[in-house]
């Protein structure tokens, strides 16, 4: 091991250890949240660098998004006494329960970070050399991915041009997609397309994928809908890191500039009339707090549990599986989400949900520990598949798991099952094509 690598490992170990001690100090009222937050930010940065060097791309992108969505408000709170200054309505979920929220979110992210570091340092498995970005993967998966991307583009433009999808404001956009059930499946296949394409693309062809994706990305950003961009793009970034793609500094700067300036500008500009353009006021923390607002469901969940509601011991994770089997097993009744405590979309309409909140609702702090450990092990396993076909499947599933960070688990099993079915079909087609080519 080179001296530089040894120094990085030592620094990383020290930052992780310091974060653990500061968190323990916070739990014992010896240290303030600002010290813990700053310490955790440094630890996350060092862990991300280590994961990048070790090509653990899926762990890296999941950790980054998990941190942003659950710590965006706390990071802003370091600089502002009122991080939710741009928000109105009932904010008691944060201000009444801040300490508890901070403790749970810190525990979850610190658990994920510690285990990611442990695996990166002690795991001897590395991504296969044939995955290198200079090599091209499976052609059928690659072109299927492009087909899915183009197919969604056509669907998206059709909905806009026919007036069925309103994009004037984000509110109009959200309202109109409720009336378009096929739109959500289009988004899903769009994310699969990105996963398949980037898992198999050769370095010299990445620019063509960027050109194909640009129209959809711009339209999503203009509507204020960043989720449909972040989920698949983060999974694509993850697989590129697994495939040893070198991230340039200008890419990081462009991402930060887009996140903190371009997107807030679009958001403000789209909600203003021409007479008030000179009054545009963009706050640096707007995007950070908006992403971090995913913390809100955790605030409600802790309130439910503290109010005497019982934890459900994994029932919200088993419910979607039960619903799938209810179609094929006679007498097995599907779960009616409107009648159970874990019908989150009915209890908190329009909020999405939170992966940490759901884990806490199922098993309190032990549930959070179990879910974080399982996620790390799963994402690590996905990194170590030995074929482009399995890598494609892994990347698509990672996109679903990233989506789950800001949503309930209820959709995850069905989406994963669809991905597996598509992969199996493509494997049969690919095998048939290769046999025919050999016969000729």
Predicted regions and their residues:
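N-terminal "leader" segments that precede or initiate the main folded domain
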Residues: 1-122, 213-216, 232-262, 410-428, ...
